[in-house]
């Protein structure tokens, strides 16, 4: 049965809290993150013609009040003023505390939402290396960074091992959003639930551990890594 393994694991981990969790209303919230290279969040909120609420996850992000809105069609999106991003996805980049002038690596960067946040924090100073292992997704990454006005980024299409070999102990900050078993996609993608299994979880865990080793090799002593 689709999702049988996942439900069994949830029940085992949550116990009596499982029923409480699923009894609570759980509306899907969609969000956008403002590109600090284009404008300030306050300027964006004052300029757009659709409803927004401040996001609890990121100062540069907003929640959409209209679930039917298609922000990707807005002119400001095409101009790189904002990025359509899951609200929770706006969190990791901010944890690194990136500052202008630093050397930053986004090791699993495609399609580029978190990468654009790192770029905004750099303010055009320093170096941002963004890697996408799948060629087609690396192309999307490149396109998105161009749209967002990022000028100090190097986009790669390499294995994480080759990136680590090319940049030993080099980066001040590294973000690793490794491929995962996709539980966060279940509400939007029924196929993700159907494909979920213990074998997939084990496979993703092994891959994540390997990528994390490569990331550590590229981090300078005293640097900061967010996984």
Predicted feature descriptions by range:
Residues 1-227:
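S-adenosylmethionine
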């Amino acid at each position: 049965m689709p999702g049988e393994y996942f439900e069994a694991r949830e029940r085992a981990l949550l116990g009596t809290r499982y029923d409480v969790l699923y009894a609570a209303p759980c509306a899907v919230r969609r969000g956008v993150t403002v590109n600090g290279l284009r404008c300030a969040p306050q300027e964006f909120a004052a300029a757009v013609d659709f409803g927004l609420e401040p996001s609890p996850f990121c100062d540069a992000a907003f929640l959409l009040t209209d679930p039917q809105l298609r922000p990707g069609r807005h002119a400001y999106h095409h101009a790189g003023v904002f990025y359509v991003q899951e609200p929770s996805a706006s969190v990791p980049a901010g944890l690194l505390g990136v500052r202008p002038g630093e050397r930053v690596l986004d090791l699993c960067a495609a399609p580029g939402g978190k990468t654009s946040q790192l770029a905004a924090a750099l303010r055009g100073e320093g170096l941002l290396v963004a890697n996408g292992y799948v060629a087609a997704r690396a192309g999307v990454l490149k396109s998105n960074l161009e749209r967002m006005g990022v000028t100090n980024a190097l986009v790669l299409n390499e294995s994480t091992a080759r990136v680590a070999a090319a940049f030993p102990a080099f980066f001040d900050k590294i973000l690793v959003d490794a491929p995962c078993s996709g539980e966060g996609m279940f509400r939007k993608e029924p196929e993700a639930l159907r494909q979920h299994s213990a074998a997939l979880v084990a496979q993703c865990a092994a891959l994540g551990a390997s990528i994390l080793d490569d990331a550590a090799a590229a981090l300078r002593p005293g640097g900061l890594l967010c996984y």
